[in-house]
Amino acid sequence: MYETRDLTGNAGKPVDTNPWPNNSKIAVSFVVNYEEGGERSLLYEDEGFETFLTEAGLMPFPNRPVRERSIESCFEYGSRCGFWRILNLFKKHKVPFTCWAIGQAVEKNPVVVGAMEEAGCEVGSHSHRWINYEGVPPETEYEHIKKSVQAIQKASPSNSAPRSWYTGRASLNTRKLVCQVYKDLGLPQPFDSDEYNDDYPYWVADPLASKPGAEDDKGLLIVPYTLEVNDMKYAVAPGFCNSDDFYTYARDAFDVLYEEGLEGAPKMMTIGLHCRLTGRPGRFRGLQKLMEHITSKEGVWVATREQIAQAWSAKHPYKA
């Protein structure tokens, strides 16, 4: 995979047909990362405790295997409190989000899947563990992908498998392995979000095809994610110090894309959230203000990533 890079994209040209329903000027995708219970811990036979996106900031990985209860407890806030605070806000405004759900986290708290389905949200997969898959043997990563799909499907009241996929810290094997797992399980190919390189969805060749453009190349739809309009910047430097920083940055990004849509070039925007970060009251205010700003505008389509993928596929099908 990834033998070449595409540095051109649409070369600055808007798509010729508005892909969004009701002639919307922008498609907005909120994404809630549900990772609590899937992070590194000695409890899960890892070498040490989690050091990424914590309230303690970036810390060196411990030289000896220890448990750090303060970090574990901060993650637990996300599943016990933060998730529900965020979910209730979306229910109040009657708009959906897509969840990147870690399979192991879902196994440890399956009730969240039913709650999201009941609220009309989409439960996508974030793989089985919240770890870096670079260097993980392909056979191990394959099993993790399979476990994640099965964990989410088991927790789903409708027995739904995830249709959207985002590993995050992916390996060069991830994309092909995900497609292979879905094929082996008899499931339709998912939509891939392990890219950050466009304001539009776009197609790539099917990783399982004999070769690009061959008869068996059905294409793979990429729905790009974001590390930019993302509350992870509360925990990395340079980043957001308070909820006003988050709100101002996300609002400005929305306003620029919304203006481009009004001028005839409707785009999509993604906003990444984490239960243990934005779920804290002091940061939550920024999300409240952003939600009010976005939902006050005409011609805004707040959608799940599956809905965005379906809309794009209908107007812009794959051309091998």
UniProtKB/Swiss-Prot annotation:
Gene3D superfamilies: Glycoside hydrolase/deacetylase. Keywords: Cell wall biogenesis/degradation, Chitin-binding, Hydrolase, Metal-binding, Sporulation. One of its GO terms (biological process) is carbohydrate metabolic process. Pfam families: Polysacc_deac_1 (PF01522). It is found in: Prospore. Its EC number is 3.-.-.-. It is an enzyme of class 3 (hydrolase). The keyword Glycoprotein does not apply. CDD domains: CE4_SpCDA1. One of its GO terms (cellular component) is ascospore-type prospore. Residues 69-303 form the NodB homology domain. GO terms for molecular function: chitin binding; chitin deacetylase activity; identical protein binding; metal ion binding. Homodimer. May deacetylate chitin. Required for spore formation. Belongs to the polysaccharide deacetylase family. This is Putative polysaccharide deacetylase. It comes from Schizosaccharomyces pombe (strain 972 / ATCC 24843) (Fission yeast).
